[in-house]
Design a protein with these regions (language model features):
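Short beta-strand elements
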Residues: 430-449
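Glycoside hydrolase catalytic-domain context in secreted enzymes
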Residues: 1-430, 451-806
Length: 806
């Protein structure tokens, strides 16, 4: 196929064999189902209640039985042919002769939920109906086994238990509507059960001797109500499993799949136990990251007294079988520590196990978390009695800490003198210290850098003993420039966009005498092509372009007279997002949190590859995924799009996704760079974070992805970082991303940012989406506020990215 033919030729050209479409294909849907099963986490299984024995009769309780949430809202939503809920999944198992389902109860929920849908409700944002005693008693006469399903939904643009801040910020528009609806349904906040759900659970517990709970959620929720409850024997964290999530859940409940997922977050006893909760809603205009590097398990495993406030530790997950493991070797060579671990299936069922390596650095002058994830491996399916040796490697320099205040060596990654312990286990809590210690004889600088993106107004941060240290304060003085535009005017489309000139564009004879395909064919260099472009041509490249075909998030490029295609972009993290009006059904993949919970890089790469095939088949060139922000707080409404509280797990999962996507010569757009951990007032909220926490926690996953997977594009975030919009932050986008990490791709804004276009270009943000402001760039250029070289550099990066795409 000719270069960029899909950008010019709008009818879909199938990628499958014999002219078949791969979009929403049986093969892709089967992969989605399999991935969902791999990431679901068995939290509890007393008396081996699961898997359900063949022939067992079951009664399905809770609206979540039919009100299935495949994924979150916003960019993570996907248009699909169908969504399989748990009732439908269990009916398939009934047809296979494995269980029998009490239909009357399920039909009761089905009728109620359909009425709520007809009144405008969306999955997960419905009210739990009252459970009639008569129906409860009929169900008990039918069976002694109950399955309760609890579901939750959240989405882009609003946070969980969203509150009006103390500083006068007023919720408006979608934020206000979603927050008010959530408050109406979830009177205790959606972290906890509603009063109606509590009443239903209590009835079921008192009536049935065998109770199983399924959690169809996208993030952290309350676990107290089942953690130590003897009346509830089994709990499956089923997450939001995509379009086949209900069937994937049934696969596990009935024993067709042995659960092997592990938590990618720490589940505390109470919402208030997370250090981020106290100030999450303190202000709509800023968030102080005072817990610093002590996020998730780094907090709970380190801070005195915090460990006892954990219900389920990071990395935890049960299986239907048992495993033993032992370290068979540990050594260091050429700066890399290698640990060999033999895993044996000692149970009666085939299954998989995940071995996790943590390191513990000496406290020294900087202070460190007690344990930090350094490597992990998942076994293949092990039959009873079968064993496998896993090789886990960690570079010594990975254990270094960043010194932002000069306690050892300012603005440097440092290995402080002392013993570095290595722990091996199947979760952070049970990881045991092995008989190997790496010793650093003297303080060693592993990488000397310079201060970048440091805070101005963060007053204090947490230390390893739970106390706080004061931080130096600075004043930020913005560089002189054009008077800033009204923020909400910036959100309007720019009128100066350029339409595509026809679909049979490969045969178009342009009037410039050159064609961009000459660069792709090696007939001329990109620099030679750039020399032909005028300054106006370059400025026109710096903004998003109109949609073509089924795209709905705009394009990039589009200089028809030079043969530069208008390459389309599309959401999102859970699959190719095409508006329903286009009539294209795609595959809805499991949410990002579930994918991270597989702890399986190879599987995630397969999902990325399959998703990219659908993107490519529908003439899209850039897929706006993966989303890699840290789960700082359970209250962030967009956590379902993100992988983990841990940057290493998030980075390795994200890198696998990018490798899979870009194997199809489709550009992945890794987002949201960076510290985008709150949706309320997301375009104007300042993330105040120390440089150490920024580098070790909130940038580290992006660094891993950039260095291991080489993404074509990075998307800067809406929020400010230490007083400067991320899209205008030169220290972040040029100093760290490009100069330190070696990123050679394109940086795009998120859609309709509040940043000034010319300031974004100067910072290294190459293109403003969904549309640019060429008149502002021209005005800034004429007043000497931006140079032609800066404009041409961003234009060149855009063209270079297009050259990488089929």
């Amino acid at each position: 196929m000719a270069k960029w033919q899909r950008s010019f030729f709008q009818p879909v050209l199938p990628l499958g064999e014999d002219g078949r479409r791969v979009t929403g294909s049986k093969e892709h849907i089967a992969l989605s189902r399999m991935a969902a099963g791999e990431g679901m986490v068995l939290l509890k299984n007393e008396k081996n209640t699961l898997p359900i024995r063949k022939g067992t009769k079951v009664a399905l309780f809770g609206k979540g039985t039919v009100d299935y949430v495949k994924g979150g809202g916003g960019s993570g939503d996907v248009t699909v042919e169908y969504i399989r809920n748990l009732y439908e999944g269990m009916k398939i198992k009934e047809d296979e002769g494995k269980v029998e389902v009490f239909d009357k109860l399920a039909k009761y929920y089905e009728e109620d939920i359909q009425k709520q849908y007809a009144d405008g409700a969306v999955p997960g944002m419905t009210v739990e109906p009252e459970l009639p005693d008569e129906l409860l008693n009929e169900a008990r006469e039918y069976t002694d086994t109950a399955i309760i399903t609890i579901c939750r939904f959240s989405g882009e643009g609003w946070d969980r238990k969203c509150e009006a801040a103390q500083d006068g910020y007023v919720l408006d528009g979608e934020e206000k509507r979603n927050s008010e609806l959530s408050a109406k349904i979830f009177e205790n906040g959606d972290f906890c059960l509603t009063n109606a759900e509590n009443a239903m659970v209590e009835k079921v517990k008192k009536t049935f001797p065998h109770v199983i709970v399924v959690m169809n959620v996208g993030g952290i929720v309350d676990t107290k109500w089942f953690r130590d409850c003897d009346e509830i024997q089994s709990v499956l964290m089923a997450w939001q499993g995509g379009m086949e999530g209900g069937l994937a859940t049934a696969d596990i409940l009935c024993g067709d799949v042995n659960p092997s997922g592990k938590l990618s977050d720490t589940y505390a006893k109470n919402l208030e136990d997370y250090p981020s909760t106290a100030n999450f809603h303190e202000s709509a205009f800023y968030v102080d990251y005072t817990e610093d590097i002590y996020v998730g398990y780094r907090y709970f495993e380190t801070i005195p007294g915090a460990a006892e406030r954990v219900n389920y530790p990071f990395g935890f997950g049960l299986s239907y079988t048992d495993f033993d493991w032992k370290v068979t070797g540990a050594s260091e060579e050429n700066g890399v520590i290698t640990v060999l671990t033999e895993v044996t299936n000692t149970g009666k069922t085939a299954g998989k196990e995940v071995i996790q390596l943590y390191y513990g650095a000496p406290q020294g002058k900087l202070g460190k978390p007690a344990k930090v994830l350094g490597a992990f491996k998942k076994t293949s399916i092990l039959q009873p009695g079968e064993r496998q040796i896993l090789t886990l490697k960690i570079p010594v320099n990975q254990m270094a800490s960043y010194d932002d205040l000069g306690k050892v060596c300012k603005s440097a990654y440092v290995l402080e003198a002392g013993e570095y312990a290595i722990y091996i286990g199947t979760n952070v809590r049970d990881a045991a210290k092995i008989d190997f210690t790496y010793v650093v004889k003297e303080d060693t600088v592993t990488e000397q850098l310079s201060r970048k993106a440091a805070p101005y107004h963060l007053q204090k941060r947490m230390l390893a003993d739970g106390s706080y240290e004061e931080l130096p304060q600075r004043e930020y003085v913005e560089e002189e420039g054009l008077p800033r535009q009204d923020k909400y005017a910036i959100g309007l489309p720019c009128p100066d966009t350029r339409g595509q000139k026809g679909i049979d564009f490969l045969d178009f004879l342009d009037s410039k005498g050159v064609h961009f395909s000459d660069v792709a064919d090696g007939k001329m260099t990109l620099d030679e092509f750039m020399d032909i472009l005028t300054l106006d041509d370059c400025i026109n490249l710096l903004g998003g372009q109109p949609n073509t075909g089924c795209a709905n998030t705009f394009g990039m490029g589009n200089l028809p007279e030079y043969g530069v295609p208008n390459v389309m972009t599309a959401d999102g993290p859970a699959g190719l997002r095409i508006l329903p009006k286009c009539g294209v059904n795609t595959t809805a993949w499991p949410c990002a949190t579930l994918l991270a919970s597989t702890w399986d890089e190879e599987l995630v790469e397969k999902v990325g590859k399959a998703g990219a095939e659908e993107v490519k088949e529908n003439n899209i060139s850039i897929w706006l995924t993966p989303a890699c922000n840290i789960h700082r707080s359970p209250l962030c409404g967009r956590n379902f799009e993100y992988y983990s509280e841990d940057p290493y797990l998030a980075g390795k999962t994200g890198a696998a996704m990018v490798r899979g996507i870009q194997s199809q010569h489709i550009g992945a757009s890794v987002k949201h760079f960076a510290a985008n951990n709150k949706e309320t007032n997301r375009k104007d909220s300042d993330s105040r974070v120390s440089e150490r926490a920024l580098r070790e926690i909130y940038l580290k996953q992006f660094e891993i992805i950039v260095k291991e997977a080489h993404p074509y594009t990075i998307m800067s975030s809406y929020n400010l970082i230490n007083g400067i919009h991320a899209s205008e932050n030169k220290e972040l986008l040029t100093g760290i991303l490009r100069d330190e990490w070696g990123f050679d791709g394109l940086v795009t804004t998120d859609w309709w940012t509040f940043g000034e276009h010319y300031r974004e270009t100067k910072a290294g943000n190459d293109i403003k989406m969904a549309a640019g402001y060429p008149e502002r760039i021209k005005e800034a250029y004429e007043k000497g506020l931006i140079t032609e070289a800066e404009i041409r550099l961003s234009a060149r990066r855009i063209l270079n990215m297009i050259l990488k795409i089929d």
